[in-house]
């Protein structure tokens, strides 16, 4: 049972508390939160990055116009199904306050960009 989660290295799937799933560029980011253990200030979490699958779809058959679209990775679908099973479909929901969500997304983007800049600078120093 829960073979997909076990293949990710999660030995005790019943310790999963919740999860979040977000899209970042051409990847889906899955973050799994575990139940907090006694004596811990924060619950443990793990993060996984899945590339989105690309498909070319026919938009207009008359003009034979095609459009590239992306969709969730097939393996990730199975993992999310198992997580929904474990959490009874209760995962961290989007905030009703859209302004706060946008601000959080913006702060996260700032961190991602800063980390990428640092990585590029380190690569430049190696040259």
Curated annotation (Swiss-Prot):
It comes from the Bacteria. Belongs to the UPF0325 family. InterPro entries: UPF0325. Pfam families: DUF3461. Disulfide bonds: none annotated. This is UPF0325 protein AHA_1169.
